[in-house]
């Protein structure tokens, strides 16, 4: 759940 990460 971040701009570049998926969680």
Curated annotation (Swiss-Prot):
Note the superkingdom of the native organism.
Eukaryota
| Protein name in the entry | Unknown protein 1
Species per Swiss-Prot/TrEMBL record = Elaeis guineensis var. tenera
């Amino acid at each position: 759940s971040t701009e570049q990460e998926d969680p």
